[in-house]
């Protein structure tokens, strides 16, 4: 398939400590890159010596991490306030969506984590406005930090059912059913696909 005709997948990835989310996103991107043009939008700290295949485009947002003992978000660039950092990130997102016709958006871990809810919802809503035919996919690992069926879990289901087309769960349901860690699983009304575990 000629690269000009390839559909374009944008993958939003954010990690605040550890790089598991990024590794999973990168491996999925590799598996898709033969048939799609894949762009990774990375909001975590840049990873030194990480080899990105030339067929995958990596866009580095101004990085944000957080202290392990709190939910305080901190820009990697100490000269930026957190608000300024988010504003710069938003400008980059807008620029990408205005320049590139995105066919599929994949969000890593969202909406099962809400630290970057405003940013991801902004991305989703703007993309829906620009391209109503865009498809939306949530990519999530086998276990999540659920709130035992609380209002937070209800909001996760509401966002999935309102904005998304597919939930990809990266596990084997015979080994680790998703409802083990997410009690509201039956409230998810969109298509669900167990992909098996993602490995390097």
Predicted regions located by residue number:
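Nucleotide-activated donor-dependent transferases that construct or modify glycoconjugates
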Residues: 3-18, 106-109
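Charged helix-capping and loop-helix junction motifs
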Residues: 118-124, 151-155
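Short amphipathic alpha-helix
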Residues: 21-32
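Active-site proximal beta-strand in glycosyltransferases
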Residues: 104, 124-142
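Conserved nucleotide-sugar donor-binding subdomain of glycosyltransferases
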Residues: 75-118
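A nucleotide-sugar donor-handling region in carbohydrate enzymes
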Residues: 139-200
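Conserved nucleotide-sugar phosphate-binding/catalytic loop shared by glycosyltransferases and other
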Residues: 5-11, 31, 35-84, 90
